[in-house]
A protein has these predicted regions:
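Conserved two-metal-ion catalytic palm core of "right-hand" nucleic acid polymerases
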Residues: 1-207, 232-233
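Intrinsically disordered, low-complexity acidic Ser/Thr-rich regulatory segments
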Residues: 78-84, 88-89, 160-164, 233-235, ...
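Generic structural signal for hydrophobic residues
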Residues: 99, 253, 257, 293-294, ...
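Conserved polymerase palm-domain catalytic core
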Residues: 162-274, 278-291, 353, 361
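Catalytic palm subdomain of template-directed nucleic-acid polymerases
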Residues: 181-189, 193-194, 278-328
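Extracellular/surface-associated beta-sandwich interaction domains
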Residues: 298, 352, 357-359, 367
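Conserved small/polar residues in nucleotide/adenosyl-binding loops
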Residues: 365-372
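Extended alpha-helical scaffolding regions
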Residues: 374-376
Length: 376
C-alpha cells in the first residue's frame, strides 16, 4: 500500500487530490454508470504479489534434528534457496485500498462490535467519537496487535494457573491451516452482512450497497487471479491478504463457530486470535479422561475428540453419536475440519481445517503437571 501511495503522489499528470476527488464523485454519483466504470477500472488493476512464506530446511538443519549438532545462522545468502511455501498478497490501485478503508468505516466497524472472545484484527474502539458519532480520523483503524495478543495469551494462562490449584486442567492450542485461502465468500454471505448493517446505520443505503458490492467484487476478481498464479483447481472466493476488509471478514467467517463453542461447550476460557485458538477447560472428576490425565497417559486425540468432536456432553445435544463442531476427515492424516453448519452462509467450497503441526494439548493436574503433545 505504501508503494501505491508513493506512486499516486508522484504521478505527474494528475495529483492525488484530483484522483481522490474523482473517486468521491464517482462513488456518490446518482448515475450508477459512472460508478460502475470507476469500479471496473479499479478491478482491472488487481494483481498478485508473491513472497516466500517458508523456506525449505537446509541439509545442515535436517542433520541436527536429533539435537546433537547445532546450526550457524548468518547473513550470508545461500547459494541455492528453495521456497517451500508462497504467500500471495493483493495489489491494486490506491483507490481500491481507499475504498477498502471506507468499507471498514461504513460496515466493518458495525460487524466488529458484535464479536466476543475474539482478539485479532479488532477495530479501534475510538474509530468514532462516542458522543458525536463522528469519525475521529485516527491514523490507525485497528487495535495494536501486540496488546491484544498478550491479552489473549495471558488471560488463558492466568485462568489455567488459578484453576490448577484445585482441579485438573486441559489447555488446547489450535491453528487453522491457510485460513484465508480456505473460505469461500459467497454472495449470500455478503448480502447477509449488508442486511444486518442497513438496519442500524445512518449511512445512505445506496452507498452501503455500493461499497459492500465493491468488496465482494474485489474478492471475486482476486480469487480468479490467485487461481491463475497458484494453479489451484478448486474454485473458492478467498480472502485477499493485504486487503483491509479481509481482517474483519476473517472474524465474521468464524462468528458461528465462536458462538457454537461458547454456547455448546462453554469452556473455562475460549479466545481466538484470527486463526489461532486457545481453550482452557477443567477436567471433569470421574470422567474417562480424568484418570488418564492424572496418570500422564492422555493422548491428544482422546482429549480433543472428547470435547470438540463428540457432542454428547454439549448443552442441548441428545444424540450421543452426533458431532460437535469438528469432524474427522477420512484421510491418512486424520485431519479435523469445522462442520459446514458452522460456516454457513459461506460457500460450499469452504473447508476450514486444523493445522496438524500447530495443534497441542497440555494437561495439568493440581498435584503435578504432565504435558502431552501430539501431531495429528
Amino acid at each position: 500500500m505504501r508503494d501505491r501511495i508513493a506512486e499516486a503522489e508522484n504521478t505527474l499528470n494528475i495529483t492525488i487530490e484530483e484522483r481522490l476527488k474523482d473517486l468521491q464523485q464517482a462513488f456518490v454519483a446518482s448515475d450508477s454508470t459512472k460508478w460502475e466504470r470507476k469500479k471496473e477500472d479499479i478491478l482491472k488493476s488487481i494483481s498478485c504479489r508473491l513472497l516466500p512464506k517458508k523456506i525449505m530446511d537446509t541439509k545442515e538443519e535436517k542433520n541436527c534434528s536429533d539435537g546433537t549438532k547445532g546450526v550457524l545462522i548468518s547473513g550470508v545468502p545461500a547459494k541455492q534457496v528453495k521456497v517451500d511455501e508462497i504467500q500471495y498478497f493483493i495489489d491494486m490501485k490506491i483507490e481500491g485500498m481507499i475504498l477498502g478503508v471506507l468499507w471498514i468505516m461504513m460496515i466493518g466497524w458495525q460487524l466488529d462490535k458484535s464479536y466476543t472472545n475474539c482478539y485479532g484484527n479488532r477495530i479501534r474502539k475510538t474509530l468514532y467519537n462516542e458522543f458525536s458519532k463522528e469519525p475521529t480520523f485516527s491514523p490507525a483503524l485497528f487495535e495494536p496487535y501486540f496488546q491484544n495478543y498478550e491479552s489473549w495469551r495471558d488471560q488463558a494462562l492466568t485462568l489455567a494457573q488459578k484453576c490448577m490449584q484445585q482441579d485438573d486442567v486441559l489447555i488446547f492450542t489450535l491453528d487453522f491451516k491457510r485460513y484465508y485461502y480456505s473460505v469461500d465468500v459467497s454472495e449470500e454471505f455478503m448480502k447477509e452482512i449488508l442486511t444486518r448493517v442497513k438496519g442500524k446505520s445512518d449511512y445512505n443505503e445506496e452507498y452501503l450497497s455500493r461499497i459492500n458490492d465493491f468488496v465482494y467484487c474485489v474478492i471475486k476478481r482476486y480469487s480468479q487471479i490467485y487461481r491463475e498464479h497458484s494453479g489451484e483447481e478448486r474454485i473458492r472466493r478467498i480472502l485477499p491478504i493485504g486487503f483491509l476488509p479481509s481482517g474483519v471478514l476473517a472474524n465474521e467467517c468464524l462468528k458461528k463457530f465462536d458462538t457454537a463453542i461458547l454456547d455448546g461447550w462453554n469452556p473455562l476460557y475460549y479466545g481466538r486470535y484470527v486463526d489461532d485458538i486457545l481453550l482452557v477447560e477443567k477436567v471433569e472428576e470421574g470422567s474417562r479422561i480424568a484418570q488418564k490425565a492424572q496418570d500422564g497417559k492422555l493422548e491428544f486425540y482422546e482429549a480433543f475428540e472428547y470435547y470438540t468432536v463428540n457432542n454428547s456432553r454439549w448443552t442441548g445435544k441428545e444424540n450421543r453419536n452426533a458431532r460437535a463442531v469438528f469432524k474427522k476427515e477420512e484421510d491418512e492424516c486424520g485431519t479435523y475440519c469445522i462442520l459446514p453448519e458452522f460456516t454457513k452462509p459461506l460457500g460450499s467450497a469452504t473447508k476450514i481445517q486444523l493445522q496438524a503441526s500447530k495443534i497441542k494439548s497440555v494437561s495439568y493436574t493440581h498435584l503435578r503437571a504432565h504435558e502431552t503433545a501430539a501431531n495429528l
